């Protein structure tokens, strides 16, 4: 088969935050992260041999920006003892506690900072970026060609992995691979994220040991949801699909079983042409829905935290921001710092 690893830049982003919170440079702080993608935890933080892990909460609580923009992550740090790699709003989408009621979302999520937990946030910024790109691309083609210089090299893993495979120069990063015992208390067949080393021989993953019990519990919920969803999709088993929905933290936070069953019926019918494996289940769902909706729904509801999609004319008011959004593949790289 094809040798494959998964790559993410969440570890690097949180690493920068941690260093800033302590008033240090990123290269002065050593970290070990372990978990699953988007639920990876900084289980060890060291500076000059000193373990700073237990001092991180105070550092974040006292930081003028992070204390406002990272409230979910800080609260998880407070209650679970470890900081998560995932951005504040996105982390709120993996656990059941911070999006239970629309009126409470603003207490945890700063919607003025990037797409930090807004409903359909990625869709909004990508729609705006696409529309702006189509408008502005002819002007971009008139600009000088981009120069690739070593000092401008970013933190994405890809080029460093290629360099290590070709030259043997060792590179340390955090990679997504099949567990195979790297993290003791997560399933062997789960895809985990943990430290690894790359050289001419490929990627080597040292053993991490046990993940702290609380973070492991959070990871295992998502692993269970993913396992149910995969088996449902492969086998066209709508019962497993419904169980996956029930186990999903956000769904379970706001929906009862009857609401979940009807929601799955509606979603299966709406996406019928892409889901041939569910043909029998979709026919049954159509019959149930034809009898009349059993649960009242909010017609036209757009979600609890949706923001306006800007037109090209509106984006013209800030061309620099629009160009950055359209040209940057990492939509979280340039987060606006707005005063609270």
Q: Language-model segments: which ranges?
A:
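Rossmann-like NAD(P)(H) cofactor-binding subdomain of soluble oxidoreductases
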Residues: 1-16
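Long, compositionally biased stretches enriched for glycine and/or charged residues
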Residues: 15, 19, 23-336
